[in-house]
């Protein structure tokens, strides 16, 4: 029986590639790549001449069965994404799950991912955090934010430059304008930059200065006083009501109003 290797690749600087990753990519029987053209540049840089097969979110359900069959037949196979660690906001989970079900050994190498450097650099608490990845693009986007409004842990999001300002503005309204955050762009690349501030100040900054590049957004968690105050406000009866909580809280009504504009 073969082995499936999950290989992180640099998110920017080629020097972030590990010796072990290079060795395994040279030794395996097959490399699965999210985009063979993009990965081809990386592989040529490290003189890795090996068979490549496309494996991405549009075909992973179809190709995983054949890949598992090859693994069961004794082939050693490596999976890489365009950048970072497969399975983290990239294809990988489905294949790993199917390989595990089939009893195949799976080894994931430690290595590059964009959110860990961004989290540590942000200056926000990183002892406990919630990785949220990409928010829904359309319907449900603000609803998801509302669900996270009372999250006490530091939150990590991936975002596109064209949606960043709107996201910051929505978060300022839902989480609070003074919530601390950090926008990290182009991690491990030439123009790497991290800007810290409140959600409202960051929204203003990027309204005036167009954001570019790949973005990791780090948002501080809600403090205990804010959570308790919001919960108390939601359960405060209106004039003429009994002490029983309202059927729908102010917070719930706000959620419904925002859902209509998602």
Locations of the language-model features?
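Glycine-rich, flexible N-terminal cofactor/catalytic loop recognition
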Residues: 1-57
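Loop/turn-to-beta-strand initiation segments
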Residues: 3-4, 74-78, 154
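Short glycine-rich anion-binding loops that position phosphate/pyrophosphate groups of nucleotides
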Residues: 11-13, 82-86, 161-163, 222-224
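Conserved helicase motor
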Residues: 54-61, 134-136
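Glycine/small-residue-rich loop that forms an oxyanion/phosphate-binding "nest" at active or ligand-binding sites
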Residues: 56, 64-113
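Class I SAM-dependent methyltransferase SAM-binding "motif I" and its flanking Rossmann-like core
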Residues: 94-151
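A contiguous loop/helix-start segment that scaffolds small-molecule binding in enzyme catalytic cores
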Residues: 154, 158-262
């Amino acid at each position: 029986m073969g082995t499936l290797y999950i290989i992180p690749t640099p998110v920017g600087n080629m020097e972030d590639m590990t010796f072990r990753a290079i060795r395994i990519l040279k030794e395996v029987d097959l490399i699965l790549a999210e985009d063979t053209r993009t990965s081809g540049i990386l592989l040529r840089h490290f003189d890795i001449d090996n068979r490549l097969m496309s494996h991405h979110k549009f075909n992973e359900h179809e190709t995983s069965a054949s890949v598992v069959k090859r693994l069961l037949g004794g082939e050693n196979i490596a999976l890489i994404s365009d950048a970072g660690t497969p399975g983290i906001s990239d294809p990988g989970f489905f294949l790993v799950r199917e390989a595990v079900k089939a009893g195949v050994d799976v080894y994931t190498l430690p290595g590059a991912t964009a959110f860990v450097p961004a989290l540590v650099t942000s200056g926000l608490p990183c002892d406990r955090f919630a990785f949220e990845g990409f928010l829904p693009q359309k319907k449900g986007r603000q609803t998801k934010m509302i669900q996270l409004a009372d999250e006490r842990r530091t939150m990590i999001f991936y975002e596109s430059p064209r949606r960043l300002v709107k996201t910051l503005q929505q978060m300022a309204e839902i989480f609070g304008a003074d919530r601390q955050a950090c926008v990290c762009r182009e991690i491990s690349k030439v123009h790497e930059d991290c800007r810290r501030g409140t959600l409202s100040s960051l929204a203003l900054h990027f309204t005036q200065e167009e954001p570019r590049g790949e973005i990791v957004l780090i948002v501080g968690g809600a403090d205990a006083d804010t959570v308790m105050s919001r919960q108390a406000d939601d359960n405060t009866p209106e004039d003429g009501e009994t002490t029983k909580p309202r059927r729908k809280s102010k917070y719930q009504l706000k959620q419904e109003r925002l859902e209509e504009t998602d």
